[in-house]
């Protein structure tokens, strides 16, 4: 329960930052900054890269999809590309950051349940999924290389409004405590918002509170899930699952496959990768300790394979949101979701060709 409270407190601060930076105009400026950098022949691949940047900065796949879906529709209308491939690029980029961002609720849940540092998990995770991201860029570029796109709408941006995201991203990368980073981001967002005229002094607490209230549903669900997991553990359910998994695996490689499959299938059942990590985290922790799996890798595989599941199931929030915003069906978008599938392939290859490294100290 104490770990759950710490995790939810961190998520609430994350969403306070999200509320503050959105009100300060940070989302619009970040999107426009990315769009202004897209070469004309690189429109769809550029959507993927912008989605990666925004989702890593914002820590939310849903927010990324909401911000970029209208732009994807516009690019589709002006180039003749199928809207499914344009929104597919957005969803792929959103899932990249959902897995990697150090202020994502999935990352917070993964590192807290496995007992490792965020920056260590990021480094281990990043080098596993980097080939998937590069291949995805090449696929989108090759599929759309014969079309040009010229953005006619206003894409004005302010680097001051992007500053809070950069502070949070760089602060997290160099290893500053996540609470310090997020609180700094909130303060900078409020200063920028007030100075730019986006936030009135009387609205400062309101915009921060709006971010916190967005956490209500996931907080309640996480508490209920944690209680259920504790009851299951008390009555021997987790031990039963552990014994079942242990009987099927042998050594570290088998343990990592067990963690990956467990994470994927639980996400497929819950359709929520944060909830799936909260549920499978204690079991993955037991497996990693039993078979001496590096906690950085167990956290990475938990986060990766729940993201793989979340990125391809037609009833997941990300695909449902993308479909609603574009008037498509999830099944029309799924064939263009190259990144989640490639991330899964890279994860499997990372397990098969795992490096022989010493186990790190558990925090």
Labelled PLM ranges:
Residues 1-13:
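Single conserved hydrophobic/aromatic residue that forms the stacking wall/gate
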Residues 63-74, 91, 102-116, 240-242, ...:
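Re-entrant/interfacial helical elements at transmembrane boundaries that shape
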Residues 92-95, 99-156, 160, 170, ...:
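Juxtamembrane and boundary regions of transmembrane helices in multi-pass small-molecule transporters
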Residues 17-34, 59-62, 83, 199:
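Transmembrane alpha-helix boundary signature
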Residues 163-195, 202, 356-357:
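Flexible hinge motifs at transmembrane-helix junctions and intramembrane kinks/re-entrant loops
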Residues 14-17, 39-71, 92, 245-285, ...:
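Hydrophobic alpha-helical transmembrane segments of multi-pass integral membrane proteins
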Residues 6-7, 33-50, 76-86, 155-163, ...:
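Membrane-interfacial loop-to-helix junctions in multi-pass transporters
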């Amino acid at each position: 329960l104490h770990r759950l409270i710490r995790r939810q407190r961190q998520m609430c601060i994350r969403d306070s930052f999200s509320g503050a930076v959105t009100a300060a105009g940070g989302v619009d400026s970040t999107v426009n900054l990315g769009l202004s950098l897209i070469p004309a022949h690189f429109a769809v691949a550029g959507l993927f890269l912008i989605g990666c940047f925004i989702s890593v900065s914002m820590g939310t796949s849903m927010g990324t999809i909401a911000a970029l879906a209208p732009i994807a529709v516009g690019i589709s209308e002006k180039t003749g590309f199928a809207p499914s491939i344009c929104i597919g690029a957005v969803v792929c980029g959103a899932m990249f950051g959902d897995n990697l961002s150090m202020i994502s609720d999935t990352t917070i849940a993964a590192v807290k349940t496995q007992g490792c540092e965020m920056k260590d998990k990021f480094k281990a995770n990043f080098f596993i999924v980097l080939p998937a991201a590069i291949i995805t860029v090449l696929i989108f570029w090759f599929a759309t290389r014969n079309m040009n796109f010229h953005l006619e709408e206003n894409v004005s941006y302010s680097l001051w409004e992007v500053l809070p995201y950069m502070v949070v991203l760089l602060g997290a990368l160099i290893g500053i405590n996540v609470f310090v980073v997020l609180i700094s981001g909130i303060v900078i967002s409020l200063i920028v918002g007030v100075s730019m005229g986006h936030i009135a002094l009387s609205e400062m607490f309101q915009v921060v509170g709006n971010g916190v209230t967005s956490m209500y549903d996931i907080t309640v669900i996480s508490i209920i899930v944690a209680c259920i997991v504790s009851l299951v553990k008390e009555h021997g359910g987790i031990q039963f699952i552990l014994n079942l998994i242990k009987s099927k695996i042998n050594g570290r490689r088998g343990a990592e496959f067990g963690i990956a499959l467990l994470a994927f299938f639980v996400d497929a059942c819950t359709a929520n990768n944060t909830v799936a990590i909260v549920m499978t985290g204690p079991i993955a922790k037991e497996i990693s300790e039993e078979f001496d799996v590096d906690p950085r890798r167990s956290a990475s595989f938990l986060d990766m394979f729940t993201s793989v599941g979340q990125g391809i199931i037609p009833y997941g929030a990300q695909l449902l949101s993308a479909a609603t915003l574009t008037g498509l069906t999830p099944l029309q978008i799924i064939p263009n979701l190259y990144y989640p599938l490639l991330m899964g392939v890279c994860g499997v290859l990372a397990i098969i060709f795992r490096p022989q490294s010493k186990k790190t100290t558990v925090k």
